[in-house]
Amino acid sequence: MRGSFFSRLPPQLSLLLLLSLRRVWTQEDIGTAPSKSPVAPECPEACSCSLGGKANCSALALPAVPADLSWQVRSLLLDHNRVSALPPGAFANAGALLYLDLRENRLRSVHARAFWGLGVLQWLDLSSNQLETLPPGTFAPLRALSFLSLAGNRLALLEPSILGPLPLLRVLSLQDNSLSAIEAGLLNNLPALDVLRLHGNPWTCNCALRPLCTWLRKHPRPASETETLLCVSPRLQTLSLLTAFPDAAFKQCTQSLAARDLAVVYALGPVSFLASLAICLALGSVLTACGARRRRRRRTTVRHLLRRQLDPEGPPSLEDAGSPVTAAIQA
């Protein structure tokens, strides 16, 4: 009877062959095992996350922005919560954010450095909050921003320094605020602006409206609703179309100082006041010294006159020329 194939081989070769076959079988088993699904990004507590870096924290009554955000989050939904303030670096741990939704919160305060680190953010929705003012430079770090909504707040003033230069911003929503005018230069920093929403604001028909009217005539496309925008005349209490005011209607308006000029005035005002005060004090001191000197001279003159009247000194008269005293003096 012939032996098996392994019995004919040397023991060392048989062992090597068995080990090789075992390795092949193990690799086949691993290859046929079901693959695991991709792991979702790190998710903030109480939020739900999905593939693609989306973190859904909507309607959870959150009082603040979650502190455990990660760089894996690309889209953050924080709408319909109770967030009342955005501190400095509120999203510093989520520097890869592309989409940020903060609608329907209780936002009243936004720090000037709240959005620092979000250089790639493209979409920001702050609508339906309680914002009355924003500090200068709030949106300056958001150089990639293409959509910004501030609708449904209580904003009464928007300075150019608040928005800053946003070269890629295409959509700006300012409707349903308390804006009566827009300062000159605010919209000039938005070269790519394609959609501008201005409805629902109490625009006032006065000189402060001139920058907005001028800009709307030069850029009719972004504000497609221009033909229906109305302003209120304070004196006549009538409504007028913003497009009904040409440049000639603002001839009586004096050009207001720019923000840079106002800053110079504010900076030099106290300095000039102190300089004027110092000059006045110096002149007062000089006049006081001159007056005192004149009074001293006057008192000296009066004193000499009194001495002459009480003890006159002078040459002897002709009547006393023959007296012994006079002769002795002359001798």
From Swiss-Prot:
Claim: Protein biosynthesis is one of the keywords in the record: no
Membrane-spanning parts: 262-282
Pfam family, one: LRR_8
Domain LRRCT: 201-255
InterPro entries assigned to the protein according to its UniProt record, in alphabetical order: Cys-rich_flank_reg_C, KCNMA1_auxiliary, Leu-rich_rpt, Leu-rich_rpt_typical-subtyp, LRR_dom_sf
Domain comment quoted from the record: The transmembrane domain is necessary for interaction with KCNMA1.
Role: Auxiliary protein of the large-conductance, voltage and calcium-activated potassium channel (BK alpha). Required for the conversion of BK alpha channels from a high-voltage to a low-voltage activated channel type in non-excitable cells. These are characterized by negative membrane voltages and constant low levels of calcium.
Protein name per Swiss-Prot or TrEMBL: Leucine-rich repeat-containing protein 26
Protein species of origin: Mus musculus (Mouse)
